[in-house]
């Protein structure tokens, strides 16, 4: 059968069919609008090529006739279809047909809802109604009618209103023609249940039950009369009616009475105590039988233990001679139940008693024959035959009390999760103790010694109180106990079978050796394969396998059996030899590499086997154990700083474990509900199920016959190479006689499933229908090296922009203290970003934007809010989950994902607590979906080019065949015809055009997109370090590696959202901790251009080498399909270069008519710059330069505040002026003359240079707060920058020098970007040291321009040892020199750098100070950073072994940046040999003050005798001081003596 190709349009009757369907559904629409739509519709061709095939009549006559008839029928329908009749333009809607008229607008010139004005109907609401024209139409009539013609504007208005609604809303396919998802056209089971319930409720209950008796009576009366019976026959009819009515009435009363009784019992159950006579009767009879057995069991179990614990000192042995609890059984006095405790909880109060001495409830015979409880402890005194056993008796034991029992149900058998026990009151405990004398002469010391009984009771209550007395309770986790007894996997054993040598097969004739290895364990994990086999090697005695098999083990106290078999085609496989390995050796050495052992059969050697064993245990969750340890440490009074270090270590471990993607999944399939039964003819199913992981079947569930809601409750454990990428597929079949039919399927990743189940949802939805109840638990495993799962590049489907505006924290948190909230962003429970915390506020304003790449519509974004705690674990505030499927959807036409809403709307979401209960806390967020264009990778592009060539050849062959058929048709036209077929190349073209084909040059033209980075291999230096990758100005790492094994990096994947590719940078950081929180944690750091990395590592992997570390990386790039706004590009962030020139006509603030003006520059209420002070002038000239970091031009506000300096008291405000930076052009220089809001103006010059500001530390526990940020990339990170990055503490600062100086100067003022220079233009020593610490060494590994820094490795800081390291820093408040009018108006720049010390003669004047001389000195405590929240500085002077306290500052509270400003000064007298001792005290209001540490400064050090400030490490932070020592009263430096001439030669 052959044919030719032709292009045709769709048949015209198809459009008419859709229009007819619209008419049927939308009958309430104006007919005029429908007709106009029909006349104006354009039946354009679909754009696809249709194929007409030429069919030979002789070959297929029947098909030809059918096709011809169909074509002619379609043409006749199209020709005969008349155009719809035009309706009069006078047709309108009238008010009587409108619905919800109370929501329609009031009267207006275009028509209204009534003839009576609203002022007349509701005069109170329209006392001041605006004037308007009278109604144009009288719409008070109650039936349709034509009142007036509609104008063109009215018709156009009606058309526009109706065209606003899309076809999907007006004509939903569910109402037009619903079809079954399986394609069988059967109705939905859920809909069938609804219809059945409606029929039973309305037709049966309401109609049949109410009128059936009446209709029956009437029918039989007519029947009897028709037959000819007399009226006496009515007696029998009414008798039957009465019988039926009585039965119905009795049934109705019985059911109603039963329902009312149930409701009453449930409501009164918690108000009364139930008696348990039946239980007590059972216990009294059972106790007599069981008590002797219990007594003997206690003696048999306890006496062997007591035999070996004799204390000595004359006591030879201990033993229980007699143990009985008496003949009276314990009783339950009553049970009180609480019915409203929750869905899965039962709570009861049990009143119990064990009182054998009470005979009030016993008969006379029982009281006479009763046996009292008695415990006799025999103590043997002496040795050998000179010994005597003395009994110690405990008698008359009585216990009674009231206990609350709370049972929480679970999902796993026995369906009890936790049992909580709590004593509601101290129990009654009474007994008699006879230590001496036995039964005859024994004396009860409990009643003889006064106060002893109450003392013993108090000891008992004090011990059980913390466990059982309210509010404490003892929790027994039944699930954990059952899990501990079950044989769960504790790890994975990787068995590598390398090879075998000299294998000896059987002596059978023509036998060849075809070996394979079978691995078995003694105790296999339930649900796993008992045998694991290697491949078969044919006809070889020295096979080479090099295969690795993974075995799940539940214990290492077993043996591994390795058997080598010889494969036989017909005969049974024969055993060549076997080998047993003791796995207990892996406890000491988890790696047994390159092992060799003999395969033996009996005592004969059958060959040599080479193998390797690697043991990977499960990472234990020690959170509960560590919580108990913290509680014990707190009870023992451990130091707070130790607890804080422990908490930080636990957080690092938790963050590290969250990155592990390999592990063991424990999957329990419980049951499936609401399966589709319409495919079954009988309505009953015989379901079975199959579970697949990454396409491999791992479990087959048994078939359950004739059950529509199967319940398996079977568990399997399986090794999953990637929790996020592995595909989980569950298929449920109906096992029929003719085979299995698929009735339900569910497919997702394990990460998505676990996230869904963690949201308090017990099931997942299958397709087409079915609720699948699953339990999935995860156990992480660290598999490194060659055993780590190779990462695969997952295709993203888009990116979600998450904007967190602000939050309102309500409700009480556990603990005492201020609320310092911050939030984290998680994707499928993996933390991607942590924001900064906002100090002491319940309404934090974050204004942060987060970009999160999305790879599955089942992923869930989670926002968690915490309260930052300086000491201890952060407190949980609440969380909210945002399913990604609510943000975007899949376009059915293009197959691409698009956003649900075009506009960005702010949503108010309420937070939920740990129990998923809604709280009063609110967060305002908005989400936007950014679609992407999938691009073929270089490897895929090669395969696509091959497919294109093959497709081109297929089309040529097809066209050639069509030409031949066309020629045959011209010769024999009666034997051929044109038939329409589907495009035979459509599937191939869709496969080729699934992604875009872009070259590297075309790809890098796209500014924004998702960068996929593959780390293939690598090593870190040192081997114990971690690798972090930061992007652009994002402070939180976009990638954190798993813990390397001996410094070797695992193969991992990272996805980063890039906002501007041309300016983007990647920062590779090697740190000591999992996440570096301080500069001391950084070992080395290197920066690369993202664009250069992409160019060099796009087609082939490349090696990166920096600071002893190296790694092999590969990059891919997926661009976005929409252009990001300028506010999200690099043009929105950068540095504002400001030159503060002068001020004119400023306000006078001093008595002399002048002011001492200086300027503060604020960015979002944060001071970033402070100018010099100009004395006694209203027209100051500053000529100072400042480099101001701007994190977001669209969100930041720059304010210039002019102040008048006062020596005493607060500075006076001279006015403010704001600068709009959002409208500045990049690189253009502007001249501004800003008018102050009071008087005068300031003259500025500046320009804006876009640049990503390099991220700093302290994301959560730092001091940068209340700043608008951008957060981006796969780990959603925040742009955090300090107000200056050019200066920091010098190398002399002990630990943390890289961060502290620059951080503190930001808040104190000064130009942080300048370096002090000497008069000849070279950097001074202090500035040079600072630049060495902060600046970066330029290196070019792999021919790339990179920037690296290697901070100094500092020792651990001990606050009890005085710190003698300090360094000079740039002055925050520079020395003010007397100036006159000429100097103030000169063009000379008066900058802080000009006041910095340089290489001058004064820099070494300390040599002129006389030894043991006394000099005056002044010390100014400027500020402290990250020392404590409430800090106080104590200054002392030490000399000659004596310590003298000279000053103590006021207690200052640190601001949001962690900076406490003092500006306090004191004087002292001392010799150069003396030392200044600076101590920090943490001021506590509710507890004792805490010493944070001390620092020591030698007054003879030349560094302190130069102008400037000094930074010293104090506690966990830094202290900035200024020392003026050794100068005269005029502040002049003593002259430097001349150097002798003999030393100058």
Swiss-Prot record:
GO biological process entries: endoplasmic reticulum membrane organization; endoplasmic reticulum-plasma membrane tethering; ER to Golgi ceramide transport; intermembrane phospholipid transfer; phospholipid homeostasis; regulation of phosphatidylinositol dephosphorylation
An MF annotation (GO) of this entry: metal ion binding
Family classification: Belongs to the tricalbin family.
Chain segments annotated as coiled-coil in the UniProt record: 620-660, 937-972
Biased composition (Polar residues): 62-80, 1318-1328, 1341-1351, 1361-1373
Ligand binding (Ca(2+) 1): 1150, 1156, 1204, 1206
Start and end residues of each C2 domain: 470-596, 646-763, 783-897, 1119-1234, 1396-1514
Name the record gives this protein: Tricalbin-3
SUPFAM superfamilies: C2 domain (Calcium/lipid-binding domain, CaLB) (SSF49562)
Keyword Transmembrane helix among record annotations: yes
Side of membrane Extracellular, spans: 228
